[in-house]
Amino acid sequence: MILVPSSFYNEDCAREYLAQVVDISKDAEVNSVFMPQYDAYFIYSGDRMPELYRVLARLGTLPEYNKILCHWDGETLSLGIGQGKSLLLSNTYKAGDFVSVMYFVLLALKSLQLNPEMSTICFMSELSSDDKILLYHYFKSVSVL
């Protein structure tokens, strides 16, 4: 998956854009969808919309200034971080356990110089009570949407 600003996007080059960041087979289906809130095209391979798209589509609806939205399916973390109306980070990570999820989220926040103690983290996936307790040690608030 890749997000390409509309000013650089050419539909005929969608496969090339994607091939620069992920390995795709020659016969893989490549799709793109315009995301007006970012003035960019979300490009992905396969017939199923990736969870990261849903994260990005919903990120702007969060009321907080520092927006942290995650989806974790037990294997992959989809993470979107925004500040105000700006998208700061959009990525996926292999995360087989919740400690790995925490690592990637906190690393991203550190690299963006955002203070988790002043931020609400939101998940679009269910969390165990133990996972929520762990999050409350680092974040001002935890929300499951």
Write out the residue ranges for each language-model feature.
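Hydrophobic/aromatic-enriched cytosolic interaction surfaces used to assemble or bind macromolecules
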Residues: 1-145
